């Protein structure tokens, strides 16, 4: 299975700025439109999806551990790590600044199209969240999904909080290490 070739609306920020709307009336960012095929072709990446920026588990455990363990992922053949959420580019950028990220790249899925294309878009209106990404991680090699780590989502709409076991950075890294002698992760 291949990842959906979704369009992402992203920002490139001017050198020396931390984002924001403008500097003396001049935007500190430039809108860029990227497709999944532009971002992930000819690379081995880990992409992890989570319910929302600035939420407790996402901010205290999931996102920071991927950033901390980046060098270990790199030693095991991963080129890049991307975090995606059904949030816009402004929110994702502000969250990356707040988290002081050094290694993980942010993938804003503001319309939820990437999550939907993967079957990971869930209805969280019962919690006031609207449509959100389910918590998952995947290893993608040249656009092909080698393995998905999907948290238990049966029934997804009933969870007051989201399960957090198999999409943890530590777990995904161990699975990659364990399969390093195999051609594929399946």
Task: Please state what every model-predicted region is.
Residues 1-186:
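Chalcogenol-based redox active-site neighborhoods
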């Amino acid at each position: 299975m291949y990842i959906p070739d979704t369009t992402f609306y992203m920002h490139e920020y001017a050198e020396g700025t931390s984002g924001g709307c403008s500097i003396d009336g001049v935007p500190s960012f430039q809108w860029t439109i990227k497709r999944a095929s532009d971002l992930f072709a000819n690379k081995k990446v880990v992409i992890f999806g989570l319910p929302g920026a600035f939420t407790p588990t996402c901010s205290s455990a999931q996102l920071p551990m991927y950033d901390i363990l980046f060098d270990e992922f790199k030693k095991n053949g991963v080129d890049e790590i991307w975090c995606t959420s059904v949030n816009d580019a402004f929110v994702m950028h502000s969250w990356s600044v707040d988290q002081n990220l050094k290694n993980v790249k942010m993938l804003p899925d503001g319309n939820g199209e990437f999550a939907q294309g993967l079957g990971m878009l869930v209805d969280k209106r019962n919690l006031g969240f609207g449509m959100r990404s389910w918590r998952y991680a995947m290893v993608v090699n040249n656009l092909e999904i080698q393995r998905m780590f999907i948290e238990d989502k049966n029934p997804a709409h009933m969870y007051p909080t989201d399960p957090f076991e198999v999409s943890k950075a530590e777990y995904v890294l161990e699975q990659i290490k364990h399969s390093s002698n195999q051609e594929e992760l399946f």
